[in-house]
């Protein structure tokens, strides 16, 4: 969910040469700043998705909801970055501690800020059940229980999924890195096919709300997206480079989003039992594959050293704050709606309060990053340093913090 600034170092020529060993390098891959910038775009898309509830713009009714696929992007990116930065000598306990240090401090503070907005501000009693939901959120288990999935800080539900992915990562990474590129390609195709097939089956099945949640939202239902990101990074660590330019990958993402938009903007295409047609349903699942394509295309281009807008100081800075932004943006939107603008009809007059809400969310995310996320992560990571080895660097694997 991004702290994304890692220790800067230049890749050696050996790091960029195709390799064929089971573990191409014991060291992590070179830092990929463009992925940090790309992460900001996904976080902004999620902001737009939630902002549409309060400050919709004309002709954007069916466009803004597509921002929800930004979460899919996060899951794919997480698998990619953790695999790209994996060090052969790393241990599961150290990995778990680094991930805890990475995501928990900002989660805790953002949850404290969210409680007045999502409970007292909306007239929801903060009783024992609500407190249990907050505890579940702070311990990364809320997405296993549909009734409390959005407890505490609602945006944090995806962290429960991420925590499950982190739990499995040490057991998945070594077998995955032993696979040759052809087998990784087959695995990627199988993951995408499984995702689309599962969604289409679920669309036509008579599922209860609980069953649908486990199928489409729970950690089990989203695991394939994380593993898909892992396969892309594993292939690149073996020297594979996608022969698709960033521009073409971007167009592919845009085309599928346009299909989803067209489909959702024509009610006659919708099923009487859902808000999406089978076409939109399948296209939504295809987004995971296209985001994986976009990520490896961006990574491939950056490894060539060519300039990219995503690597500019502005984009990298915003990407660095994006985890805090993701955690705080919904609290800002819901909070301002309670004390100021409420829920407005579509209008261009919503632009000023929308921009102000965005500015406030960015400002608070910068503060949360500088005052909590970064210093707390640094302090917690320092506990991994053994007293007898203070001169040995304990910096995280380069680029791991982008996940």
Q: Language-model segments: which ranges?
A:
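C-terminal "closing" transmembrane helix and its immediate cytosolic amphipathic cap
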Residues: 1-25, 308-315, 330-403
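Functional transmembrane helices that form membrane-embedded active or gating regions
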Residues: 24-44, 62, 95-97, 102-104, ...
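Functionally critical transmembrane alpha-helices in membrane proteins and complexes, commonly lining
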Residues: 30-87, 104-111, 132-146, 152-154, ...
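Aromatic-enriched alpha-helical transmembrane segments of multi-pass intramembrane proteins
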Residues: 36, 61, 129-159, 163, ...
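Transmembrane alpha-helical segments and their boundary/interface "anchor" motifs
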Residues: 39, 68-75, 86-120, 128-137, ...
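Membrane-water interface at transmembrane helix exits
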Residues: 52, 83-87, 114-118, 122, ...
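Alpha-helical transmembrane segments of polytopic integral membrane proteins
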Residues: 76-79, 83, 169, 229, ...
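Juxtamembrane interface at the ends
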Residues: 204, 292-308
């Amino acid at each position: 969910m991004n702290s994304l600034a890692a220790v800067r170092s230049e890749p050696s020529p050996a790091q960029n040469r195709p390799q064929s060993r089971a573990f191409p390098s014991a060291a992590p891959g070179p830092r990929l700043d463009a992925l940090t910038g790309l992460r900001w775009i996904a976080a902004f898309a999620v902001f737009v998705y939630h902002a549409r509830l309060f400050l919709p713009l004309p002709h954007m009714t069916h466009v803004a909801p597509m921002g929800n696929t930004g979460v899919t992007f996060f899951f794919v990116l997480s698998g990619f970055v953790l695999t790209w930065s994996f060090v052969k000598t790393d241990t599961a306990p150290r990995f778990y501690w680094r991930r805890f240090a990475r995501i928990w401090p900002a989660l805790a503070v953002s949850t404290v800020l969210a409680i007045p907005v999502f409970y007292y501000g909306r007239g929801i009693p903060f009783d024992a059940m609500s407190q249990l939901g907050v505890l579940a959120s702070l311990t990364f288990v809320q997405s296993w229980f549909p009734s409390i999935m959005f407890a505490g800080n609602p945006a944090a539900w995806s962290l429960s999924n991420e925590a499950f992915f982190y739990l499995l990562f040490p057991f998945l990474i070594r077998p995955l890195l032993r696979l040759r590129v052809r087998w990784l390609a087959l695995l990627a195709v199988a993951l995408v096919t499984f995702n689309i097939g599962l969604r289409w089956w679920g669309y036509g099945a008579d599922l209860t709300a609980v069953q649908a949640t486990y199928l489409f939202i729970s950690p089990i239902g989203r695991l394939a997206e994380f593993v898909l990101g892992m396969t892309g990074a594993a292939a690149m660590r073996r020297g594979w480079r996608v022969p698709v330019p960033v521009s073409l990958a971007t167009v592919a993402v845009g085309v599928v989003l346009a299909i989803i938009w067209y489909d959702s903007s024509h009610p006659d295409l919708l099923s009487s039992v859902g808000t999406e047609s089978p076409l939109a349903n399948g296209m939504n699942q295809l987004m995971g594959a296209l985001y994986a394509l976009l990520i490896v295309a961006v990574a491939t281009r950056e490894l060539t050293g060519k300039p990219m807008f995503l690597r500019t100081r502005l984009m990298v800075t915003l990407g660095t704050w994006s985890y805090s932004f993701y955690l705080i943006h919904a609290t800002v939107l819901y909070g301002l709606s309670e004390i100021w603008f409420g829920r407005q009809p579509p209008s261009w007059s919503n632009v000023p309060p929308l921009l102000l809400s965005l500015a406030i969310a960015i400002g608070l995310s910068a503060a949360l990053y500088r005052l909590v996320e970064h210093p707390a992560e640094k302090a917690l990571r320092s506990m991994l340093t053994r007293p007898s080895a203070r001169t040995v660097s304990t910096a995280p694997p380069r680029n791991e913090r982008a996940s």
